[in-house]
């Protein structure tokens, strides 16, 4: 083998990279175990322990625990539990605001039509709106709609339609970006570990948010869907507010003393000045938490009795500026509780508002210290004197000294009020507040007129950009609404982990046994070693991407292992052929690798094509599956083709392993001299296939498919009861209360206690409280089946499984459902087209392309038909969802592998035997690849059966579709793709009678 040195170096470097990234997971597991041991079951103490170490360098002196947790392999929501939502910023609402809410009939009608068409069209709302408006108002320029005060610097009466459309796209993108920034900040403040938030670039206005470990979904819904509230406030100085804080601390001391037993209150303590005592409080708390200084812990407890507030709040000693105090982030909740007490509020001025800064104190970010600002309310109604809706634009730039700054422009009304506000606060600070947190508090040097301002300070370029984003958020024209939602309880996630690990281990063991039994111990173990390396490299690469490992990702990994065996099977089968031809082991193995390479390359590349399409058109779990599948295929190509070759070359260069036969007693003569007349009955095969296709289409037309809410829109609730229930009993209860809404109930698992309830009840309605109202309504409806003492709070608690509760839920809005349906159709069609084009390019004969695509289309129709025939009476769900579409595409990718291998052999035989008739040539090609076809199919079926039996309910339907795909894909290679390709080519050269094969 050439380039051995490169392969070795690459393998070593890849191994080091994978070890490096996987090591972070071991570090975090170590500290998580220490936290659990320290906490002894107290979740809050465990989290406080980890938080106290978050910014400590715990790995090689370079990486903090927080950074290590960001680098580890995280678990997806279906394994860890949590919440996945897709939010949508209404593009039509944004366009209305940009047009100043015009009442023009053509404008409103065009916008309404565009919004409706967008659910099924591949074009976005802006394109559809422009097209419809031109139909309704021919010749009317778009500038007459959008030459508004808000867009005065971007659109004029002379602007062309193309220029206006460009501005609309920029403004809509800015609105979505603003929403993204607001959501990101809210989530960061919420304290979720390893959140994932991303704009869905292929869908205008949509943002996906994944929040692992969430236990309060209703709180999250309100957090995510609330409108951004940007405000400008006047401020106090620290020296003005410190006396009030001292009075509050004194009041709290009395409150704490009254709550403390008398014998504890008698302890003698030396009273030090409150502010001085609080100076090192953050360090003391961290040390106490870790148990490093018991004396310090006792002293701290005494300080908190004497000065409850100042023990955790350090007053600004300079007395200058609006920052009155500092506190560690884990103490902010307790400080808020203290400051909200009526007794403490009575000590404060009526116009004082205390608000936290949004980010840690810039001079001490490691300690996670936050600043407390003193806001002054001067309006009678208690509102801010100026709000963000007056901001027209904001951008980050550099001032005349070359330092980062932020420029801001306001509308006419805002400019007038801004001039008044700045005039009254010369020499003081004005706080910029978003969602209740202070982002900046610049000092006013002089009155600002005209509405144009420049904010300067000690900004980094990133901070200037963030502040500009905040200011732009103030004019966000439409809040984001949840259009899709999935909630998984942690115990359900643990069950998925157990099922996934079990299916993975059993599949790996069976694959190893199978390879050894078919090809002998040493070749089998070499192939098995490649599988282990495949797993190691795949996990390492996933870790380097900071990707989350999901149940579908585990399935993709397991399936990639099954498909990885295909490369070893191809190599070993070709090697056996060369050995039977009389070659020595060295030469046979070298030729085996060489002759199998093109088939391995083409089959892997076609699978990657379907994986890429799957990734681009899928969302959530489908993307996770596609990612692991693509990585697994790429790695399997490297390990099977190059790494195993290094092993054999190393030993055979020393004249070792020269007695290998690459077979066992079981497989020695398996299909070695097969002479099946496949082509002689090609018309029978095609007629039979045609009849099956007609039957499948008839069932699809009459019985249809059981579509889940991914395609219809609606809500799913997976409910676990204390006792066994009948699905029909549950359905009747719900149907009697949910009116005309569609309701379906199916059993989940085998214990008879868990059901999945699907309904489209009130799915068209939007609002922050709709989901909680429906959960409450469901609780009232199912009360007769619940344990008597179950409350609503217990019922909706995803962690509770006693007496009956919701353990997971899912919501898919109508617009999302339509998009998923369109994307599913396009993904399958594009996969077929892409594969057909690739086969044409590689084999340079359209007969191969037509045969392949026709066979793949047959596979797809037969799988759909089987689901149509079987749903309703099989003991597991056969509903059509995004995962099923993923299975279809994966089956297509697997099926084309087989066809590529056969056609590659046909192409090879054309070169070796140019005078042999096509009839015999096709038969010989099918017979010589039959052993590979059987071995690959069996090895893949072993994996799929493990997933099907052991993988759990969530992945069983996927495995069933894949099993159908493997079975029918193998058959279609022999009885559809090959006969069609043969029939299309046979007219180019005469055929000989079928008896010629038997000579």
Predicted regions and their residues:
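Hydrophobic transmembrane alpha-helices and their membrane-interface caps
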Residues: 517, 521-571, 849-908, 975
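Juxtamembrane segments of multi-pass membrane proteins
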Residues: 698-746
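Pore- and gate-forming transmembrane helices of large, multi-pass membrane proteins
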Residues: 183, 491-511, 563, 578-619, ...
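Non-transmembrane, solvent-exposed regions of membrane trafficking/translocation machinery
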Residues: 23-31, 51-60, 68-435, 439-443, ...
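Hydrophobic alpha-helical transmembrane segments of membrane transport and translocation systems
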Residues: 8, 12, 533, 538-541, ...
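Cytosolic juxtamembrane regions of multi-pass inner-membrane proteins
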Residues: 562-606, 647-655, 868, 874-936, ...
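Juxtamembrane "pre-transmembrane" interface segments
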Residues: 210, 451-454, 462-509, 777, ...
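Interfacial helix-loop-helix hairpins and adjacent transmembrane helices
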Residues: 1-17, 21, 25-69, 73, ...
